From Swiss-Prot:
It comes from Schizosaccharomyces pombe (strain 972 / ATCC 24843). InterPro entries: Gal_mutarotase_sf_dom, Glyco_hydro_31_AS, Glyco_hydro_31_C, Glyco_hydro_31_CS, Glyco_hydro_31_TIM, Glyco_hydro_b, Glycoside_hydrolase_SF. Keywords: Glycoprotein, Glycosidase, Hydrolase, Signal. The keyword Isomerase does not apply. This is Uncharacterized family 31 glucosidase C1039.11c. GO terms for cellular component: endoplasmic reticulum; spore wall.
Amino acid sequence: MFIHRMKSNLASLFLSFFLLLACEFTFSYADFSTTTSDATHPSATATEDIFSTPAVPSLGLAQNPSVYEPYRGDKCGGYNAIQVSEYEKGVLAILQLNGDPCYAYGTDYPFLALNVSFDSIDRLHVSIQDLYGAQFQFSKRTDVWDAPLYHFQPQFGDRTYNFSFNSQPFEFWVTRVSDGEVLFDTRGHKLIFEDQYIELTTNMVDDYNVYGLAETVHGLRLGNNLTRTFWANGNPTPLDRNAYGTHPFYLEHRYTPSENLNSDGQPSYTSSTHGVLMLTANGMEVLLRPNYLQYRIIGGIVDLYIYVGGTKNPKDTVSQFVQSVGTPAMQQHWTFGFHICRWGYKNVFDLVEVKENFKNFEIPVDTFWSDIDYMYEYRDFTVESNAFPKDKMMEFFNSLQQSNQHYVPIIDAAIYAANPINRSDDVYYPYYEGVRRDIFLRNPDRSLYVGNVWPGFTTFPDFTNPETTNYWTECLMNLSAAFGYNSSFPLPYSGLWIDMNEPTSFCIGSCGTDKLDQNPVHPAFILEGEPNNMVYMYPEGFEHTNASEHASAYQASVSQYYATATSTVESVKATSTPLNVRPKYNINYPPYALNTEQGEGDLSNLGVSVNATYHDGTVRYNLFNTYGYDQSRVTYDSLTSIEPNVRPFILSRSTFVGSGKYAAHWLGDNYSLWSNMIFSIPGALTFNMVGLPMVGADVCGFMGNTDEELCSRWMALGAFLPFYRNHNSLGSISQEPYRWESVAESSRCAMNIRYSLLPYWYTLMYEASSQGLPLIRPLFFEFPNEPSLANADRQFMVGSALLVTPVLEPNVDYVRGVFPGDNSTIWYDWYDHKVIYRQHNENITLSAPLTHINVAIRGGNIIPMQKPSLTTHETKQNPYDLLVALDSDRKACGSLYVDDGVSIQQESTLFVKFVANGDSLSIESYGDLQVHEPLSKITIIGLPCAPIGVYFEGVQVESFSYLEDTKELVLTNLEAFTSTGAFSNNWTISWNLPV
């Protein structure tokens, strides 16, 4: 903190000095204020320009996205750098507008302040703001968002980058010292800095490989013909459009041909990776084009962070970034089990039945979830007492406690606005207490902002208000009481699912103002499963395997379509923005219209309006993308105040940079389609790049009806993503894995692997939490020098040891995949431990019957395992196994992290290192946690011949076998050597091979 403040104070002194010089040198403050004041201060704008309360709910005003208009920056002259000061820790300068204002999509500032800070040896910060600070500055709102990059500590060593610039016009570029690579380069592009439009452009190398820029539904590699919009959106998983979260960080990976050939005699490459974060909560577009990448921001300032990365592997760049914004929270051990959920578990008896069915079918499950069915009329912090009576809920919670299983309910962001003339609403504490404490979002005239969500007209908590945390904590305790709270259950639920927290609202503006006497009102559309909205959608290929059922569903869907009224809205630009004419400041309809997914492009469609205000008067226009982050933060603080030192488990739909510190994430309301299963892989990989590694998709699909084949394949795939939950929607057919015999078998097989790998998963989570490393990784992360892997996103790595190759299409019993690395890299099949023979870059065909998913082990790894059971708790009590996969040099290594699986602050932990050489396997343990479970079995694959003898700390091991076909040594009955715990002491196992 001290270092950060010292740097800030130094910069302030320089800027104050520059202000004095600039005022004398070029302009007077009076001139500046008359030019821009009404354009930069929303409070100075007429009320009707920023306040919209429609008389009736509507779709808003349709917009034509500005990205499709002819480019307007050609006549902008950019800025010149004056009064430049270079010092040890950065560069300070004033930037002066070069020529007349160009009014691209706003009013140009005549003077800007440049502050380049050499934050660390591998991170550079470039800040550009208007000279007098009229623009909203997100970095000043540490009450809303805080991160380690604001509190950096000094690092010793030489900087790994150089910052260079030209003054007239001002342009800059950043170079990596080690290889001379230019990482960010604005040369040839003019900076545009206006009150509602900022444009910054960097040159890109040919055919660049860029990843990240979440959240959208897209392939892993973004390509060079894409516009990414950052505007939190509650619409279900739109392809190539803005979705729930905002993570304006990208990772770029470059390949450089080498003069040398690899061991296969093929051309070889070196590679490098770097990352860039444009930190803003305002709306933004990023244009990826063949030779450049361009930021277009509709407010705020330029707040750019460049991460130098390096030439070793992309994981280093991810680690640099994640550690700067906050490493992800360590998850509880049970969260890596299987979770079952649906919108449609209509009473507690449904939950009990599902629990019993999993037990009867012997399918592992750890957590049962409730969607909004459990609430009284969909109102937060209530329980429908007829369907979920307290006594039956307590019986259910007791049964979960006895079986060491868990329960997670949903909480939506919106709070039902009580009907003032309905006496039964008088007891709705969350609303009246929120009004009393003044913790809800307001309209600009200070009236309550009232939107429309599931329960009817609703209000929205202001999670930036310090008072909201206490309010939220009390509401969570009230929910415990509503479930039947007693002293044996501090919280009857083990985590919280926070949803609809972009936040979503089903109308434009404060549509419930003066209408609360109509509550509760039905959402402004027909719910799935209601008349005229029955679910007839099935996966691609369903017509080939279920022809008669498909024909019936198709005919019914056609009839329903023609029975439902439809309408269209003409798309016109709501606010005319003529060329080179100063536009009017307007936050509801900014001069630059973002290319959004919502409705017809109105920024407030399907969300709380941009003119809604926070407790301090800040409009949502400037904090639009942080609502889910702040709800996660407040929920985290509330849960830790209720159960101190217990790691909160929070699943959030909307996320922002650094949300991983507080929450996990699922990929949202997907469809039961093969295409959606495919996109779940790049989606999960991308979130692992941006610091939210605990991520997964709704297995088998949320909307529409799944089928047996899709669900079987998806249950297998989901077992290898960090967060593993089956969830589907109201009106869809049931899709628990026991509904079909093949799905049950596929699930058991995949879960058997997942649960046996719990020690491995948990160790990966520890590395993510401590170092910012991803749990799952694209192939190029582990094999960074192979250009053919740049687009690979239908296979992925779990850690560095396992390669997963799922089937992603219907009606096949095979799958094709690559096994990276040169001839020195060995891959073993998970199931039979045989070597997978292939040529470099060869796409080989693998057998994949319906209940099978292909998994390969990378030689050189040691994987800690435990015998799987039906819950994570039972599995954790079982003996350990070690799987040792030797590489071509007959070496391997691995690690294990163990703690109590629950606590934030650990009293004791254990970290174990495993090392295998040609004739021995050794462990070294660090820490004082006593692990009582013994070691049962060690499997060593890749040993060329049978050993003459095997010894545990010099004592001969009698129980071992060697399988010639797989070159596999199996040691069993090791409990006798490790009865006090598998890793309570350091030990070495050695073997003698024949000469």
